[in-house]
Amino acid sequence: HLWLVRKKDGKLQVLLQRRAKHKESFPDRYDTSSAGHIPAGSDYRESAIRELFEELGVHAKAEDLVYCGTRRVVYDGEFCGKPFHDRQVSKVFYLWFDADESAFNIDPAEADRVLWMNLDACIDGVRHNTFPHCIEMDELEILCSGLKVDFA
């Protein structure tokens, strides 16, 4: 998972993308700047920059991504009304990137808009579920660790 980060008016901001309305999982919910599944054996950084370009039209270099940590998910239950078994290993990265929301070339198959949000407001909103999202608190904690900022 790749987070685009910038500093604006002295505060850290993260770019969120709102998933497209037709997506089977989490439609109309805000998510990580860019994320995707990678083929077995593929490089995490190369996959992250490929997804970033496909989803948002942003070119980046693998060496510019800052590694924050690894997130593991093991889930057995129900999702979208069907039995679901999820096994994920996600590498969490961030990339310093400052551009207006209108500058992104959003793939409508993936998302319908992007939004810069202050990091502390994002954490608070996810914690208290005050905006539609599919962001996990543990991922924000990993991001904050990589950014070397307090996870409030």
Question: What positions do the PLM features span?
Answer:
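Conserved beta-strand and immediately adjacent loop positions that scaffold enzyme active sites
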Residues: 1, 13, 113
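Short arginine-rich
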Residues: 2, 58-61, 128-134
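Secondary-structure boundary elements
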Residues: 9, 57-61, 100-103
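Conserved Nudix-box catalytic region and its N-terminal flanking loop in Nudix hydrolases
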Residues: 11-58
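Nudix hydrolase/Nudix homology domain
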Residues: 28-30, 34, 69-152
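A short coil-to-beta-strand element that immediately follows conserved catalytic motifs
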Residues: 59-70
